[in-house]
């Protein structure tokens, strides 16, 4: 089974233990992943698409008061509704990376926890009276 297919099944199905592990590890590694995304990955993605900072990509849904700088922070402070899709892109990439890291960790933990297949128990020894009856039968056949 390919790792992409396993990851998709993990992300879609999962179970309570996987979710609990994800929450705990996600909380612990959230800042590290945020730094990796914002400091390492998003600048490269930004260079490819011509924008270095995705957090300032937005669509204004109202009128901007005169004299307000055209930045996301300033427009939000002015109370103008905005659709901040750049921030969403950053958060979505952050989520995918974090989910993949958790998936790999849970996969490794599950690999360690897998039990070796249990061999079926040996059939019980034939009772002595049955063995004697078989011996008698075999001796009568001769």
UniProtKB/Swiss-Prot annotation:
Gene name of this polypeptide: mscL
Main location: membrane
Membrane-crossing residue ranges in chain numbering: 10-30, 40-60, 86-106
Signal peptide: none
Species in which this protein is naturally found: Acidovorax ebreus (strain TPSY) (Diaphorobacter sp. (strain TPSY))
Pfam families: MscL (PF01741)
UniProt subunit comment: Homopentamer.
Protein function: Channel that opens in response to stretch forces in the membrane lipid bilayer. May participate in the regulation of osmotic pressure changes within the cell.
Annotated localization: Cell inner membrane
Topology of this chain in the membrane: Multi-pass membrane protein
A GO molecular-function descriptor: mechanosensitive monoatomic ion channel activity
Alphabetized PROSITE patterns for the sequence: MSCL
InterPro entries reported in the protein's UniProt record: Mechanosensitive_channel_CS, MS_channel, MSC/AndL, MscL_channel
Assigned keywords, A-Z: Cell inner membrane, Cell membrane, Ion channel, Ion transport, Membrane, Transmembrane, Transmembrane helix, Transport
A GO cellular component annotation in the UniProt record: plasma membrane
PANTHER family listed in its UniProt record: LARGE-CONDUCTANCE MECHANOSENSITIVE CHANNEL, MECHANOSENSITIVE CHANNEL MSCL
Protein name (record): Large-conductance mechanosensitive channel
Family note: Belongs to the MscL family.
């Amino acid at each position: 089974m390919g790792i992409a297919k396993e990851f998709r099944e993990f992300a879609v199905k999962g179970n309570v233990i996987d979710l609990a592990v994800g929450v705990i590890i996600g909380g612990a590694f959230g800042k590290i992943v945020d730094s990796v995304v914002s400091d390492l990955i998003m600048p490269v993605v930004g260079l490819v698409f011509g924008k270095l900072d995705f957090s300032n990509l937005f669509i204004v849904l109202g009128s901007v008061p005169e004299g307000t700088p055209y930045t996301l922070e300033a427009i939000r402070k002015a109370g103008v509704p905005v659709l901040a899709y750049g921030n969403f892109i950053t958060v979505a990439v952050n989520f995918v990376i974090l989910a993949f890291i958790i998936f790999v960790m849970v996969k490794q933990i599950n690999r360690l926890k897998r039990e070796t297949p249990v061999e079926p128990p040996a059939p019980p020894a034939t009772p002595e009276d049955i063995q004697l009856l078989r011996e008698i039968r075999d001796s009568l056949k001769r």
